[in-house]
Curated annotation (Swiss-Prot):
The lineage of its organism: Bacteria, Pseudomonadati, Pseudomonadota, Alphaproteobacteria, Hyphomicrobiales. This is UvrABC system protein C. InterPro entries: GIY-YIG_endonuc, GIY-YIG_endonuc_sf, GIY-YIG_UvrC_Cho, Hlx-hairpin-Hlx_DNA-bd_motif, RuvA_2-like, UVR_dom, UVR_dom_sf, UvrABC_protein_C. Residues 65-143 form the GIY-YIG domain. It is found in: Cytoplasm. PROSITE patterns: GIY_YIG, UVR, UVRC. The UvrABC repair system catalyzes the recognition and processing of DNA lesions. UvrC both incises the 5' and 3' sides of the lesion. The N-terminal half is responsible for the 3' incision and the C-terminal half is responsible for the 5' incision. Belongs to the UvrC family. Residues 253-288 form the UVR domain. Keywords: Cytoplasm, DNA damage, DNA excision, DNA repair, Excision nuclease, SOS response. One of its GO terms (molecular function) is excinuclease ABC activity. It comes from Rhizobium etli (strain ATCC 51251 / DSM 11541 / JCM 21823 / NBRC 15573 / CFN 42). GO terms for biological process: nucleotide-excision repair; SOS response. One of its GO terms (cellular component) is excinuclease repair complex.
Length: 679
């Protein structure tokens, strides 16, 4: 059951055929059957002036004993907490009674100035809606899943005579077979690299494929079978593709046995060159499996979760098994109240984790979490198949879980060490530059271009827990009046766009209040930077400070410049800070290493963004400039005509003969390449 956000803040459920009749409940609380919009109802109590437990107590009087979801809001309208309940009256009533709450709950209750509610037909629906809202609203007092980047998959395309193999992330819009999820892009890259050697499947785009007149370098180094120029027959290539699918589907022994038989037969026929090819392909398959670590025979499709909770920090390690193969693992460090138990953290994490991800048939846990039966029912409803959640006690599966627990413990220890080191570095940064408090958010900027072309500005972000990659931003330089190679002009555009938008969305911060709250452990990650680092000298800093003054935020952000020394050697950097002469740091100063690391990360990110933009420009197709021609129609045209040049020469009747191209679209394409005829 997936929700779609509505303008009024509700969620529309649209994947059911059930009745849309309203559910009648007492009071003013709105019901939320599956097929109608979630109508949050706060009643009129927010105008009474009541706050905290008194306000909650008044709400309880009109709540039903129905399952549902509630939101607690502060005086500014920010969502403090989202929760679900089997009985709204009983669950919310717990906040109003005089019993002793934890510090976290007591603080949340004191700040509550309004509440909103929605009833659901079942507690399962309430659990799914709660997870959806927590991920979208990120309330301060909920357990929050960080680093929720989608997982990459391997895609073998199915809409071309010669299927290609790609890394894929996001919606499965393209026809083909998807294999995964993999824990990281690196794991996908290594697997594709080995699969190329084993099965010789192409990795080029369709537009490049259609324009080849001779095999590319990958064919020469035996990484592709050359279907573009018919170096391999269509039947032979289809067999290679099927073998790759079989291997990724868990039939690795069948594939390896077939290759071994072919190798032995070639050797018996004294065709040693062909035998060597099969030998190398077998070695490539073994290389794939050597990177997969443990592959338990009794686990076909499962995710394995283990939690290690110590020192107020939780680490949840996840291993992914599909088709009997280990596709990698990833560690998560959810934001949670240190007073919560590991079972409470794990339960909240699981519901959010699968909110936008495919659910496997089996989920294994290192320990029992809360409401496992309810969670299994909710995930089964979402996935459309039965999902079992178990805590293995013995045997191979218990050994597997223990292995994941060990990984969680090690990752937890590394995280604590890194966090402690980062805190010391931020304190040292504060002392070095004379700041009022240790910065909680540092933004580092750099530009990248080649002679002014495809210019990109990059922004990376660092904080108490290291680099915050979901806060990175890139800025494609758009100004036409900037002289090619004008770094000052590029930085001016980046700064203006960044802070103009920040002022519009967040307003100018109150630094006095922020300094007082800088050490609060439960404060959300700030949107405004305390410090910005610019990779440049006095000229860059003069331009940046002029922009900050123009925007009226000179006192809101500390700007620091980093200029390389005369010989441009690392360790000879000169720093430009406000209110003091430029200076250098001792070569072995830890703060200097810290700043160099941040600058190098900004440099890496800016160069990477520039390369992506340059690559897109290099493979840009004239069909991309035609409105209404998306990837599918572009692919259909290229498959029919071969090249964009052939499309430009095609007659209107020929364009209309292409599958998926209507008369209106054909005229649009024809007119684009024949402007005189259009006039």
């Amino acid at each position: 059951m997936n929700g779609r956000k509505l303008p009024d803040g509700g969620v529309l459920y649209d994947d059911t055929d059930e009745s849309e009749d309203e559910i009648e409940v007492e009071g003013d609380v709105s019901a939320a059957p599956l097929a109608v919009a979630v109508d949050w109802n706060a009643g009129s109590l927010n105008e009474t002036g009541l706050v905290g437990a008194e306000l909650i107590g008044e709400f309880v009087k009109r709540l039903p004993n129905s399952p549902g979801v509630y939101r607690m809001l502060n005086a500014e309208g920010d969502v403090l907490y989202v929760g679900k309940a089997r009985s709204l009256k009983k669950r919310v009533g717990n906040y109003a009674v005089g019993r002793v709450h934890s510090n976290r709950i007591a603080q949340m209750v004191r700040q509550t100035a309004n509440m909103e509610f929605v009833t659901t037909r079942t507690e399962t629906e309430a659990l799914l809606l709660e997870a959806n809202l927590i991920k979208r609203l990120r309330p301060r007092f909920n357990v929050l899943l960080r680093d929720d980047k989608s997982f990459p998959y391997i895609l073998i395309t199915g809409d071309h005579r010669a299927p290609a193999i790609f890394k894929h992330r996001g919606a499965r819009a393209r026809k083909g077979d998807y294999f995964g999820p993999f824990a990281s892009a690196g794991a996908v890259g290594r697997t594709i690299n080995s699969l190329q050697r084993a099965f010789l499947i192409r990795t080029c785009t369709d537009s490049v494929f259609e324009t080849r007149t001779r095999p590319c370098l990958l064919y020469q180094i035996k990484r592709c079978s050359g279907p573009c120029t018919h170096e391999v027959s269509d039947e032979g290539y289809a067999e290679l593709v099927q073998e790759a699918k079989d291997f990724l589907s868990g039939k690795s022994q069948k594939v390896k046995s077939h290759m071994a038989e072919a190798m032995n037969q070639a050797a018996e026929d004294l065709d040693f060159e062909r035998a060597a090819i099969y030998r190398d392909r077998l070695a490539a398959l073994s290389h794939v499996q050597s990177h997969q670590g443990i592959n338990p025979a009794g686990v076909d499709e499962a995710d394995v979760f283990a939690i290690h909770h110590e020192g107020g920090v939780s680490c949840i390690q996840v291993f992914f098994f599909r088709t009997g193969q280990n596709w990698g693992n990833r560690a998560y460090f959810p934001k949670a109240d240190p007073q919560l138990s590991s079972a409470e953290v794990l339960n909240a994490f699981l519901a959010q984790f699968y909110d936008d991800k495919p659910v496997p048939k089996q989920i294994m846990l290192s320990e029992t979490a809360e409401e496992l039966e309810l969670l299994a029912a909710a995930l089964s409803e979402k996935a459309g198949h039965k999902v079992s959640i178990l805590v293995p006690r013995r045997g191979e599966k218990r050994d597997l879980v223990d292995h994941v627990v060990g990984n969680a413990r090690e990752a937890h220890g590394r995280k604590l060490a890194e966090t402690a080191s980062q805190s010391r570095l931020l304190e040292g940064f504060k002392e070095t530059f004379g700041l009022a408090y240790a910065p909680q958010r540092i933004e580092i900027y750099d530009n990248s271009h080649i002679m002014g072309t495809n210019a990109v500005g990059g922004m990376v972000v660092a904080g108490p827990e290291g680099f915050v990659k979901n806060q990175y931003r890139k800025f494609n330089i758009k100004s036409t009046d900037i002289t090619p190679g004008d770094d000052f002009g590029m930085m001016k555009e980046v700064m203006t766009r960044r802070f103009s938008r920040l002022i519009k969305e967040e307003g100018i911060p109150d630094r006095t209040a922020q300094a007082a709250a800088a050490d609060a452990a439960d404060m959300p990650f700030p949107a405004w930077p305390d410090v910005i680092l610019i990779d440049g000298g006095q000229g860059q800093m003069t331009a940046v400070r002029a922009i900050l003054a123009e925007l009226g935020i000179t006192d809101s952000v500390t700007a620091i410049g980093i200029a390389k020394g005369v010989d441009r050697d690392a360790g000879r950097e000169r720093f430009f800070a406000p209110g003091r002469e430029s200076f250098t740091l001792p070569p072995r100063d830890p703060v200097l290493y810290f700043i160099q690391r941040m600058r190098d990360e900004a440099h890496r990110f800016a160069i990477g963004s520039h390369r992506v933009r340059r690559k897109k420009e290099m493979v840009k197709n004239p069909l991309d400039e035609i409105g209404g021609i998306g990837p599918s129609r572009k692919r259909a045209l290229l498959q029919h005509f071969g090249t964009a040049k052939a499309v430009s020469r095609a007659a209107l009747s020929d364009l209309m003969a292409v599958e998926g191209i209507s008369e209106a679209v054909a005229k649009q394409v024809y007119n684009h390449f024949h402007e005189d005829a259009a006039k």
